[in-house]
Structure formats: C-alpha cells, structure tokens
C-alpha cells in the first residue's frame, strides 16, 4: 500500500496538481484486534512522506471500519474523511443522526487547504452480493439523497457501474429540462 501511495502521489506531483488532489484509502483489515490495527495505521501514517500525508484521505468501508472509526482516526492524524453512503448503509454508525447531521461531522475533518469536501455515492445492486454497486441510478433514491444534502458544499463522486454514463444520468435526473444529453445514457 505504501508503494502504491508513493506511485500515485508522484503522478499527482508530476502533473503539478496541488494538495487538493487527494489519494483515497480504506483503513484495511482488523487482524483480530481492531484497536491495535487502528493504532498501527496511525503509526504508519506518521512515517509516510509529507507529500503523501498532505494528499491522503480515508474512507469508511462496508466490512470493518465505520464512519465513526475513520472519524476517530482522522481526529488523531488530522486528515479528511470521505463519506461513502453505501458503506454507511451496510456498516452504520451514529444511529441518532440523519444524513445531513452525519455529513456535518465529516465536513469538520476538511480544512480549507484540503479543498472541497468529497463524498462517494452509490446504490446497492439488488441482484448481487451486499455492497455491489448498481448499474444505473435509481432516480427516486438519488433525488432523496440529493434533497437531504442540498445545503452542503461538496463534490459527489458516483460509484455506479456505468461510470460516465451514470454522471449523464444524474444530470438528467437533477436537471431534466436543462439537460439535453438524456438520450446518450439511455441508449
């Protein structure tokens, strides 16, 4: 993982991109002791090259590390958290908070030097294993999510199997009258 981080950081550096261009990382396994694994992650982080540390952001996952876990780590090492909605649905935390309140906690991990807060958005493919991404967006589900976050300033990355076509679909869902490329993703 460290070699991969070094490689990808070098690419961003060679492209002369500032530190708002980020490297997204899951924490990893728990190896029988989650708190020990968290402490190892924090220890290793402190020994990374400074340019990697400036670009690194951590994400909640759907197996081991809840949003609460990654926010704890974030607080210890002062790096941003990227929220993944599907992972949060599968492995939830903060049961008393709604989506907006949860994202306010995530937003606190982002500093001006990090750029705009980023989130991952995906939907469950109901015909596949838990955590598998959907091929297309379900319009109602997507609109409900967007309604709940409408007052937040952030970038949303879509994790949908149709990739760029899903971005066109999202524009069509959000702006049906203004968006003229609707047939591109439908064909």
Roles of regions detected by a PLM:
Residues 1-3, 58-68, 89-103, 165:
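Active-site glycine- and acidic-residue-rich loops that bind
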Residues 72-74, 81-93:
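Long, repeat-rich segments with strong aromatic
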Residues 79, 91-187:
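Histidine-acidic metal/acid-base catalytic patches
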Residues 27-31, 60-64, 85-89, 123-125, ...:
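Active-site-proximal loop/turn and secondary-structure-junction residues that shape catalytic pockets
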Residues 56, 84, 156:
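Conserved, mostly hydrophobic/aromatic
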Residues 1-76, 80:
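Active-site acidic/histidine proton-transfer and metal-coordination neighborhood
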